Amino acid sequence: LQMVRFYSAIANDGTLVTPHFLISKPQSGEVAEWESTETGVDETVLADMRSMLRSVVTDGTGAAADIEGYEVCGKTSTAEIASEEGGYKKEVYNIGFCGFIDNSSSNLVCFVGANEVYAMRQTTQIFNDIMENAVKQYNITSMPSN
């Protein structure tokens, strides 16, 4: 959840929001409100972070997370797994992808993690599936880049 909190600050122009699990779309008239905190992070730093996270998706290991017509920003992660015999397990990793859709009507951040797997593409593809569904279900629209 700490990674989601960090990414939400980038996605929300420096406003730090505590993550919440979205179980269902709020009913009409129902408003969900949570506390937030301004971080005071410089706009230039936030723009640089978004640009770097976008390049992971456009030019790097996060390509499978991209959604046509949207600016997906995110980062893959890989961790070796300690072996009981010493050293690390061979060719199996704990992996993840955390990201958001920049320049959109949404503040959603999504983290997908998988333990003891062989391929990075699994988490990026699952992120893509989740966020494409969210785009449709919550009518998320893309906005012009700044």
Language model: regions and residue ranges:
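Intrinsically disordered, low-complexity repeat and linker tracts
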Residues: 144-146
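A conserved catalytic-loop motif detector
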Residues: 8, 41-45
